[in-house]
Amino acid sequence: KGILLVLKTRCKKKKFNNFLNDYVNLTKRYFNFNELKNEHWDEKDIFCCGSDQVWNLDLTNSDEIYFLSFAPKNTTKMSYAASIGKELSDSEKPFFYMKLKEFDFISVREESAKNKFHEIGIECIQNIDPVYLLNKNELEKMSIEIPEEQQPFVLVYLLQKSEKFMKKALDYSK
């Protein structure tokens, strides 16, 4: 059973990578901030970050990468539907102000984030989750047939590994 799970996981990863190669224009892979900072970005004029939990400091450990700190000064820095995923605490406000004042355009997903950023003098707008940018026909063009499961299952989506949550999900599935 363990081998079957490994094979299924490899198959899913291959399909995901094929999707990225077919539909997303990717740069080479970077593994740390210094690699990004030392790159020559001569042909790039806009840097964009955003979406799911990208500015949740608890998940990203306040990593500079998510605030585009590596981008050259003469480029445009922007976010699209950047998500904090939680309420912005008073202690986090100075950090966000220092990082986001460098951005040219900011959009966030949560209304609460928009309001908190306005309170600290950061202009931004609220945008929808990017998953809603495509219509049904566009999504169907990219979809594949998935065989129907032979038995009921529970789908678990975790932002970070959690043995406690996995135990709850396994208990629920019984």
Question: Where do the model's predicted regions map?
Answer:
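Hydrophobic/aromatic ligand-binding patch that stacks against planar heteroaromatic rings
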Residues: 69, 116, 172
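Short hydrophobic signal-anchor/transmembrane segments that target glycosyltransferases
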Residues: 164-173
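Short intrinsically disordered, low-complexity coil segments enriched in acidic
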Residues: 1-5, 134, 174
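Active-site regions of enzymes building and remodeling cell-envelope glycoconjugates
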Residues: 66, 75-77, 121-126, 174
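A nucleotide-sugar donor-handling region in carbohydrate enzymes
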Residues: 32-41, 55, 81-159, 163
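Aromatic- and Gly/Pro-rich donor/ligand-binding loops
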Residues: 1-98
